[in-house]
Regions:
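Aromatic- and acidic-residue-enriched carbohydrate-binding clefts of CAZyme catalytic domains
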Residues: 129-140, 209
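Short, small-residue-rich loop/turn micro-motifs
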Residues: 126-130, 156, 189-193
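Conserved, well-structured interaction surfaces
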Residues: 7-14, 18-28, 43-119, 135-150, ...
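Short, small-residue-biased leader/transition segments that mark boundaries at the very start
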Residues: 2-4
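Short coil/turn linking the two alpha-helices of tandem helical-hairpin repeats
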Residues: 116-117, 123, 190-199
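Short, surface-exposed recognition loops and adjoining beta-strand edges that mediate ligand/DNA contacts
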Residues: 27-43, 125-128, 164-182, 195-236
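TPR/Sel1-like alpha-solenoid repeat signature
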Residues: 105, 181-187
Length: 236
């Protein structure tokens, strides 16, 4: 549950940031800040190491260590998006309250992008699921890969409208509207490339119609142009 005060919301969001699938050198699919022991495994399985070895003497856990299923994070985001608006009027700083909503949309888009680029279409959940005694009601079918990228774009458009344009509102290292634009440009470039160079399979669960490639490239281009217009960033 959320503590509906500034510190409570900040704590809630901090946990979501901590779990973001940021693919740096200390990230595994299971989480951020992998331990020193685990960190040594990454070069071993990526081809970076000069020599690699395997001491896997058991099949227990096979196929699970590298899984990327962000639905725990997505549930926490959906819980926030569903419940926070009822308390939003309690905060005098409406800019900050909007920024928190923008962060939630940004984080959800980030998680979905991490999954869709690995698996193609995945189930889209807009609200937290509740177990009511029937497990079948929780089994949501996969959406198409196109639907997932469109959902990511939708979330990032909302994030762009709600997030501040500087770090002073939320704090250093947290999302701004420009982070939303940057992520959108990257995600839409992926979508356009999948459409142009990939093939559609499984009734659209994997792949995007080639005719839509330029539409996604245009979305990526417009996001970059909006970033350029801010005059806050440059290539180096």
């Amino acid at each position: 549950q959320m503590c509906i005060r500034d510190r409570g919301i900040t704590s809630y969001m901090t946990t979501l940031y901590y779990d973001l699938p940021i693919e740096d050198f200390r990230y595994t699919q299971q989480g951020f800040n992998v331990s020193g022991k685990g960190q040594g495994r990454l070069p071993n399985v990526s081809g970076e190491a000069m020599c690699s070895s395997s001491d896997d003497i058991s099949t227990i856990g096979d196929g699970t260590w590298w899984g990327c299923w962000d639905y725990g994070k997505i549930r926490r985001v959906n819980y926030f998006l569903k419940n926070f608006p009822a308390y939003k009027s309690n905060f005098q700083n409406t800019v900050l309250a909007d920024a928190w909503m923008g962060e939630a949309h940004f984080i959800r888009a980030y998680c979905y992008f991490a999954m869709v680029k690995r698996y193609g279409g995945v189930p889209i959940l807009r609200e937290p699921q509740e177990y009511v005694g029937d497990i079948e009601s929780l089994k949501v079918p996969r959406d198409t890969e196109k639907a997932c990228y469109d959902f990511i774009a939708e979330d990032l458009d909302k994030a762009f409208r709600l997030l501040p344009d500087n770090e002073e509102i939320l704090g250093k290292g947290r999302a701004t509207k420009y982070a939303a634009l940057a992520l959108k440009s990257r995600a839409m470039l992926y979508a356009g490339s999948i459409a142009r160079y990939g093939t559609v399979d499984l009734n659209g669960l994997v792949g995007i119609d080639k005719a839509l490639a330029n539409d996604y490239f245009e979305l990526a281009y417009k996001a970059v142009k909006e970033l350029e217009k801010s005059k806050k960033f440059s290539l180096y």
